[in-house]
């Protein structure tokens, strides 16, 4: 009888300890299999924040054309990455670490273009009777194409659940955090692995955007430039000089004018130097970091006879990044 009572008490204690606040890490997602490559591309190019064509019919038509032109090439990219994007499993590992470090909250994640979608995650949290939510954008800098798209999707999904009305707070950018930037600098130094920083051109490569998006008022370029300036200040404080510190834009798509300079241009321009790349706009490794930066541009660097070409990993599921997320959530104002 005592054993039964003990088990009942344990169940009651566990129920009492069940977190009433959930933190949802919001990101773009990536194919979880080669089959999902089509799903990923279709959802991305049907997003009005990505393909800013106001007419729904025209957007779907143009999006379908883009998907058809890119799907086979994209599948080959993901084949080189093991048949899927690393973004989802790394994010899962990050939430596992977060839940161990901070059991007072429940950490989970939702993706914009592949499962688990925000609607699925929120339905699960409604069943858990969560009372408050934090939508945490995994993009350090704000952009309508990433942050706003994810928030819009999450809030629409929440609105559709008529009986679930938790308190909601958001973290929409965090690039200005000194703690974050110290972690980034340490990642760069770890990648250098005792090489002399002053021998290297440091390129902060970020995802590119069409110039028209910036002209329409998106603050992304401004925030990326500010982020680099903050990191330069930190490098001066830490007496960590580089030959040059530059900002570049990658992943151009289509004939329209995009933000410049491109990462390829800077690699070619500094072909006679040692180069180290840090993916400043991403916190979790994905095809743009592991394929584009670490494979495609590495081959380019080899053809150009670049003296040395290094690519830093993203923050991923590191304990330092997990601790940063927890601190950011705890310090979030009501």
From Swiss-Prot:
Fe cation binds at residues 207, 288. It comes from the Bacteria. It is found in: Cytoplasm. Pfam families: Ferrochelatase. Its EC number is 4.98.1.1. The keyword Transcription does not apply. GO terms for biological process: heme biosynthetic process. It is an enzyme of class 4 (lyase). CDD domains: Ferrochelatase_C, Ferrochelatase_N. Pathway: Porphyrin-containing compound metabolism; protoheme biosynthesis; protoheme from protoporphyrin-IX: step 1/1. One of its GO terms (cellular component) is cytoplasm. Keywords: Cytoplasm, Heme biosynthesis, Iron, Lyase, Metal-binding, Porphyrin biosynthesis. Coiled coil: none annotated. It catalyses: heme b + 2 H(+) = protoporphyrin IX + Fe(2+). Disulfide bonds: none annotated. The keyword Metal-binding applies. GO terms for molecular function: ferrochelatase activity; metal ion binding. Catalyzes the ferrous insertion into protoporphyrin IX. Belongs to the ferrochelatase family. This is Ferrochelatase. The gene is hemH.
């Amino acid at each position: 009888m005592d054993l039964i009572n003990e088990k009942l008490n344990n169940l009651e204690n566990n129920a009492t300890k069940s977190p009433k606040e959930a933190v949802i890490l919001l990101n773009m997602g990536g194919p979880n299999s080669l089959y999902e490559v089509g799903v990923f591309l279709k959802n991305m190019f049907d997003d009005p924040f990505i393909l800013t064509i106001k007419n729904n019919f025209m957007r779907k038509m143009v999006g379908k054309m883009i998907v058809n032109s890119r799907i086979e090439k994209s599948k080959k990219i993901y084949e080189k990455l093991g048949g899927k994007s690393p973004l989802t499993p790394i994010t899962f590992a990050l939430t596992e670490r977060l839940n161990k470090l901070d059991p007072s909250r429940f950490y989970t994640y939702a993706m914009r273009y592949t499962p688990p979608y925000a609607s699925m995650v929120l339905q699960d949290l409604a069943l858990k009777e969560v009372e408050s939510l934090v939508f945490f954008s995994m993009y350090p800098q704000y952009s309508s194409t990433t942050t706003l798209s994810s928030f819009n999707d999450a809030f629409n999904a929440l609105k559709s659940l008529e009986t679930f009305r938790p308190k909601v707070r958001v973290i929409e950018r965090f690039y200005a955090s000194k703690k974050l930037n110290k972690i980034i600098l340490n990642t760069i130094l770890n990648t250098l692995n005792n090489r002399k920083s002053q021998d290297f051109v440091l390129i902060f490569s970020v995802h590119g955007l069409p110039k028209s998006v910036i002209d329409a008022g998106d603050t992304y370029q401004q925030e990326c430039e500010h982020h680099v300036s903050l990191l330069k200040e930190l490098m001066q404080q830490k007496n960590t000089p580089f030959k040059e510190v530059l900002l570049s834009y990658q992943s151009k798509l289509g004939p329209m004018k995009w933000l410049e300079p491109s990462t390829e241009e800077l690699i070619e321009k500094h072909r006679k130097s040692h180069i180290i790349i840090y993916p400043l706009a991403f916190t979790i490794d994905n095809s743009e970091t592991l394929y584009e930066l670490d494979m495609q541009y590495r081959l380019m660097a080899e053809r150009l006879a670049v003296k040395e070409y290094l690519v830093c990993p993203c923050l991923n599921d590191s304990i330092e990044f997990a601790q940063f997320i927890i601190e950011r959530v705890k310090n979030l104002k009501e």
